[in-house]
Each structure stands twice: as structure tokens, then as C-alpha cells.
Amino acid sequence: MYEATKEDSFKEFVIAQLSRMEAPEGTAERLPAQDYSAYFFALEQTGNESYRQKIEDVMKTPEWTLELMPFITAYDTKYKRKEHYNEIAAMFRDKQQFTGYDLVSLIDTIAQMSEEIYEYYRELRDLFQVIVKEKMKNLPNSSEIMEIGYSILKACNIGVLQKEKYGNFGEFVWRTIAGIDNNTCTGLKDMICAQHIIFNKQEV
């Protein structure tokens, strides 16, 4: 939400949550994998080197999963000169079926990639476009409507999908989720909200 609004309250919330989780043995294993990128945000905002250590701790994870790919890609882009892009792309390339959460991991991974290594960026971009078109066929009755909506809006915001062609689907999902119980959204509603704010700002 901070990316979308630039309101300090959201930044302070993230830092406070990470601080609350501090423990002598570390917190990498206690923070949900999809939230690991918060360590990059906290490091950039505070300069506190303890967050860099948290990042390094996560990178010691013995097994890569799709859920970890956005974090690993961010690390590879920032610190490793993009040398593992082929392995990152292979994680998605070798996937036979994609769930809604896999789609979210894919677009979040693309968002962390540099277009300088265009071969792999383009591969994942093209893969995303194929998958999302298939997922959209099940709207509006898909059980993955939250994941699809978030992925479409974010893809429009980072130039992976054309706003003119796909933006209305993202808007449709945004209108639809107003009636979904917040307790069932597991953070996705806030994620969609942030992307919707960015989407509308870019339209101005």
C-alpha cells in the first residue's frame, strides 16, 4: 500500500510488524514466504543492516518454490547481477498447471526482473499472457477471482498487459470483491486495492 499511496502510516506499519516479530533466533521462518520482500522494503527505508541479514537468512532456504520466486528474483536483480534468471524462469517453464497463487507468484516475479536480460523477461511475460487468458475464461465465476484480478491489475501497471485491452477486467474484479468477506482474502484484497490505486493514478 505504501507504493500506491506513499503514506507514512503504511511504511510505519510494515516496520512495526517486522520489529514485533524480532527474536534472538531470527524471524525468517516465521514470516510467510509471500511477505519476505518486506525485508527489502525495510532495509531500503531504514538502512538497518539487520534486515540485510534477514534477507541472507532467507536465501539459505534449501529448496526453491514458486512462492519464493519474487523474493529470490529481487535478490538476484539487486545483488547477484541477474545470474540466476535462467533457473528462475525454469521454475515456471517446467510448471504443468498454474493455480491462482502461482499466477500471483509469476507476475510478482516478472515485476522484480530487469528487462536488460530480455530473453528471460520476455519468456515469463509471454507465459503470463497465455495463462491469464485461460484463467479469464472462467470469470466471473472463478474461485480464483482475487488472484486473477490482482495479477491483471499489476500486469497492466507494469506494462505486461495492455491497459486498454485488460484494464476493464481488473476494474470488474475490483468492483466484485467489495462483497467478499475480508476474513477470506488473506491480504489479497489489500494487494488488489494497492494495484487499483496505482492503475487509476496512471490513468490520470
Predicted features along the sequence, with ranges:
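Asp-box/WD-like beta-propeller blade repeats and closely related beta-sheet repeat scaffolds
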Residues: 49-70
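CBM-like carbohydrate-recognition segments
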Residues: 1-20, 24-54, 140-204
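Extended ligand-binding clefts on enzyme/binding-domain cores
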Residues: 63-69, 73-149, 161, 165-184, ...
